[in-house]
Regions:
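Local cysteine-cluster metal-coordination motifs and their immediate loop/turn environment
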Residues: 2-8
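C-terminal structural segment of proteins
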Residues: 9-308
Length: 308
């Protein structure tokens, strides 16, 4: 579980309470700022200071520091490490460094050609100021259930490279996310890169989400990917987010559609099966059944677009 997880949850629920009491902090507690020159140096610092936190884009960390919801002894700034800022294609895989910003994903022609789902999703993340600061590694490490990129990695079948003092390991996206703001990342480890398979031209992808306003947290979202062959859908993956405690696949609905045409009748039947695998967690103003309805609306939209 991430050391930041309780703090992130607290950010969502405590700001109004603190403001109403008049005790909102706007400056962080004292900490030591460290800017390592290599990944190895960063890992050494994290190993020496168990309560240290990593600063990548800072989109989520800085508000938590300012509100004193986290008070680390050290903040390790990895933003200047070129080894974590790459876009490359090799052996059928697109590799994305953890420090790539959301705006980089949205603007990259390489990403557009190799993984259009990621580019489409990046354009939905927050507002331009957020996309200019937030990083792909930070989003995945934070594992916000309402985040766009974790669902995309799940839909594509991506994998995540993690590095610690003991070496590197690669974790499939399907097992990386374990709960609300929780991943398999261990203290002292850094998320180094993401890899996604470069898919054939017959694959089609759709990204969509529902929010009260553009840039708000999603009430429900969907990253969909499938292969259209002679009018029939194959290998369909429907990854929903902002529904449960982590992104999840609607396996039963996808299995029903395997080998079938995306006719209106088939799509409608598949929508009724989403609840077999997706079990939404309600929030104020958007209960479980409302979220499930949103998921159905998104699925119908996405599948209709894939069929067009």
């Amino acid at each position: 579980m991430s050391l930041l997880a309780p703090a992130v949850i607290a950010v969502r629920i405590s700001w109004e309470k603190r403001r109403n009491r008049g005790d909102v902090f706007v400056k962080p507690a004292p900490f030591n700022y460290v800017k390592p020159s290599s990944v190895g140096d960063a890992l050494s610092i994290l190993g020496e200071h168990p309560d240290a936190v990593v600063l990548a884009g800072g989109q989520s960390l800085l508000p938590m520091l300012n509100m004193r919801l986290v008070a680390p002894s050290h903040v390790v700034d990895i933003t200047g490490l070129p080894a974590l800022n790459e876009i490359s294609v090799a052996d059928g895989w697109l590799r994305l460094g953890a420090l790539l910003r959301h705006c980089d994903l949205a603007a990259s022609q390489t990403v557009a050609e190799a993984a259009p789902l990621l580019q489409e999703a990046a354009c939905h993340i927050g507002h331009p100021a957020i996309r200019n600061r937030g990083t792909i590694g930070g989003s995945l490490a934070l594992a916000d259930p309402a985040a766009e990129l974790p669902a995309c990695l799940l839909a594509i079948g991506g994998r995540i490279e993690i590095q610690g003092l003991d070496g590197k390991r690669v974790v499939e996206a399907a097992t990386f996310f374990t709960g609300t703001f929780e991943t398999v990342l261990k203290q002292g480890e850094i998320l180094r890169a993401v890899e996604v398979p470069v898919l054939a031209a017959e694959y089609r992808s759709v990204f969509d989400e529902l929010a009260r306003r553009h840039g708000d947290y999603a009430l429900a979202g969907l990253a969909a990917l499938g292969r259209i062959n002679n009018g029939n859908v194959r290998d369909l993956r429907l990854a929903f987010f902002a529904a449960g405690d982590k992104p999840a696949l609607a396996v039963t609905a996808a299995q029903f559609l395997e080998g079938k045409t995306l006719s209106e009748a088939n799509i409608d039947e598949a929508v009724t099966l989403i609840g077999d695998d997706i079990h939404p967690i309600g929030q104020p103003g958007c209960g479980e059944q409302t979220k499930l309805h949103h998921c159905g609306v998104l699925a119908k939209r996405a599948l209709s677009r894939m069929a067009a």
